[in-house]
Amino acid sequence: VSSDPNTAPPSASQNVYDDASFFEGYRTLRQGDTGLNGALEFPALKRLLPDLAGLHVLDLGCGFGDFARYARAHGAVSVTAVDVSSRMLDEARARTEDGAITYLQRSIETYHAATRAFDLVVSSLALHYVEDYAGVVARIYDSLRSNGRFVFSVEHPICTAYPAGWVRDEDGHKQHWPVDRYRQEGRRDTRWFVDGVVKYHRTVETYVNTLLKAGFTLTHLGEPAPIPDALAVRPDLEADCRRPPVLFLAATRAAS
């Protein structure tokens, strides 16, 4: 039996993206990318990236491989793209013709990269599905080379704290977003396309201090709004200007 943790079968971590109903709903959502990913998350991510030329990159929760292909198109030498979902990876491989992108089916919590293997680690809207955030952060730190960067986004804690959605008036207009149980960190059972989608709520404080404790230097904290062009196409996204849907953090491993 191999002792390499990355040759083991995928773990029993949540894999809702392989649910047929969920996957079809998500794929439909991403068509044209006029939703949250295209209107807000990916534009904000690109603003935080270093020059990708010559870098070895790790993409945790790679989904359809959009970032992996972007990184290669902008000069990355190699991209290791990890996702727990076989459906997502099948779609990613179908969209990719590039031998320098390696797709691996693995949960984020069980993937172990080699020490100092990467210059950049990116994770887009995936770590709020992870229970052991501290363990993942520690392994990411170990996987980075000197001056390596970790850039990631998560669903904003004011959204995960009390996932009840907008409070609306009798005509259905959005009035306000309730925030409750903010300091009660832990599991939240939610509905997104299907019932039983598990997320893990953490405070902003925990997201930041866990990075610092692991040895990272925080370089950016952001709560971006949709870009103007997206609002012109999707005026309903104006609600995401009223409360931040996404939290971005960027951190660096010190030179050593």
Model feature map: region roles:
Residues 214-216, 234-256:
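Core SAM-dependent methyltransferase catalytic element
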